[in-house]
């Protein structure tokens, strides 16, 4: 019996030692893993950060945020305008504005037609106007360029040039005169086309708006 108890104690001791060995081994392994994770985290903390890249990224994000805030404000204002009361108010304001514009333009048109009739009618008025534009165009291109050439030739700088340089300059001026002559002819053709297209037409509200640089369709919607 005594020997049996010793055997049991011995066996029990063997079991406990085996369990303790497993527990100690597991604990040691866990501690090792924990140590490795902590070591990796320390390495990550020690990685150098590029402050310049962070600053650039911060500026870009700040700019995007500002634009988004502006867009949000615009959308909020649009929502307010699109509310039912605002739409009605805006329509009333538009109609009032159109009524005032129509009245003012009608007065200007009547006054202009009286002057045109005194000049012999719309055709005579337009011919005189086109002739005045042609004379102004010819003076600006021909006389203006000739005056500039004369001033340059009489200057001290031009006199100091060699004969070769003077010839080169005159050649360049002749080319410029040819280009200006082409432009003058093109502009004169446009003026002649205006006269041709006006045949059988009268001075009306649409032409008045064009001359006043107003959008006819805004005041007189179809």
UniProtKB/Swiss-Prot annotation:
Record organism: Saccharomyces cerevisiae (strain ATCC 204508 / S288c)
Keywords for this protein: DNA damage, DNA repair, Meiosis, Nucleus, Sporulation
Subunit structure: Forms a ternary complex with DMC1 and SAE3.
Record InterPro entries: SFR1/Mei5 (IPR018468)
Cellular compartments annotated: Nucleus
Protein's GO biological process: meiotic DNA recombinase assembly; reciprocal meiotic recombination; sporulation resulting in formation of a cellular spore
Pfam families: Mei5 (PF10376)
Lineage, top ranks: Eukaryota, Fungi, Dikarya, Ascomycota, Saccharomycotina
Family, per entry: Belongs to the SFR1/MEI5 family.
Job description of the protein: Involved in meiotic DNA-break repair. Required for the recruitment of DCM1 to meiosis recombination hot spots.
Protein name: Meiosis protein 5
GO CC annotation: condensed nuclear chromosome; nuclear chromosome; nucleus; Swi5-Sfr1 complex
């Amino acid at each position: 019996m005594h020997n049996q108890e010793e055997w049991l104690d011995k066996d029990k001791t063997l079991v406990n030692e085996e369990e303790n060995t497993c527990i100690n081994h597991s604990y040691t392994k866990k501690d090792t893993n924990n140590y490795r994770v902590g070591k990796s985290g320390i390495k990550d903390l020690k990685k150098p950060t590029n402050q310049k890249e962070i600053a650039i990224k911060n500026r870009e994000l700040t700019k995007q945020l500002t634009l988004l805030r502006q867009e949000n404000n615009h959308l909020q204002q649009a929502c307010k305008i699109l509310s039912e009361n605002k739409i009605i108010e805006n329509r009333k304001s538009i109609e009032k504005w159109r009524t005032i514009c129509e009245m003012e333009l009608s007065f200007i048109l009547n006054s202009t037609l009286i002057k045109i009739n005194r000049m012999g009618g719309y055709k005579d008025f337009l011919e005189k106007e086109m002739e005045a534009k042609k004379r102004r165009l010819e003076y600006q291109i021909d006389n203006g360029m000739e005056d500039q050439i004369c001033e340059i030739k009489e200057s001290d700088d031009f006199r100091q040039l060699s004969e070769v340089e003077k010839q080169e300059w005159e050649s360049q001026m002749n080319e410029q005169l040819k280009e200006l002559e082409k432009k003058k002819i093109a502009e004169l053709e446009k003026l002649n086309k205006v006269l041709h297209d006006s045949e059988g037409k009268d001075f009306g509200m649409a032409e008045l708006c064009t001359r006043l640089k107003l959008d006819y369709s805004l005041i007189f919607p179809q």
